[in-house]
Structures are given as structure tokens and as C-alpha cells.
Amino acid sequence: MLVIDELHNVLAGNSVNRREFLNLLRFLGNELRIPLVGVGTREAYLAIRSDDQLENRFEPVMLPLWEANDDCYSLLASFAASFPLRRRSSIATPDMARYLLTRSEGTIGELAHLLIAAAVAAAESGEEAINHRTLSMTDYAGPSERRRQFERELM
């Protein structure tokens, strides 16, 4: 299996480069006879749709946003266990999950950025645990906030 992450970046190239890349994907699928998995945003799907043969080889699957449930608590517990902090980070709770998911807008990549920033703040401050205090110390801005900041700068 060949997993291609950030597949939407194919759209960054010019039309000739895009076509060459899509041809390469088709060639790899045919020659290697292995499944291809493309991961990316909505734009990744649009790039694949531009080639009829490739579109038939990919089945789009939408990943849902994370919700505060047992799977999420397990994910948060795994994150907490992975950070080299001296104190236990109690982030795998319903209240903390809702707070974290609201700030990260429910995506795992944003959640990881937020928690890494909080772990750094916890270590640098001597707190040695992720909690509301260390989360408020981060300079993390979620996707919507970053867009608003960018749009303000354009004005």
C-alpha cells in the first residue's frame, strides 16, 4: 500500500506538472499492483476527480471531526502519556475534551498542535502538566482564529 499524504498539494503545480503527477500515480497503481491511498483536503478529491481513470480507483471517505466520547478520551490519554512531563496531565475528561475540541475545531492535527504547545508551556513554566493554566499560556491559534488574524492584516 502506498499512502500519499497532503495530496491536495498537487494543485499547487502548473497544469503540466499536475498531469505528470497524476499519470505517475496511475502508473504506480498499474505497475506495482498495490493499493493507493490519498489523504488530504477537499482539494485532494478535486485533483483526483480531474482524471477519470484515477477517480475510479479512489473511494472518497470523509473523516468526521472528533467528538467528546470514549474514543476521544482514549486519544487524549495517549497524548498525555506521550509527553515527557513530570506530573500527570488530566486531559482525558469530558470537560477538558470539550474545551480542547472547541479550541482545535475537532481535527486531530490541530489538537496535536495545541497539546504540543501546552506541553512546551508546561515544561517551560515548571508546571510540568497540561491543564487549563498551561493551555492558556500557549500562543496557539485555531484555524478560524488564524483566518481572522490574516484577514485583519489584509485590511
Residue positions per predicted region:
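Walker B catalytic acidic pair
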Residues: 5-7
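The catalytic "switch" region of P-loop NTPases
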Residues: 9-14, 18-91, 95
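C-terminal alpha-helical "lid" subdomain
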Residues: 69-70, 78-155
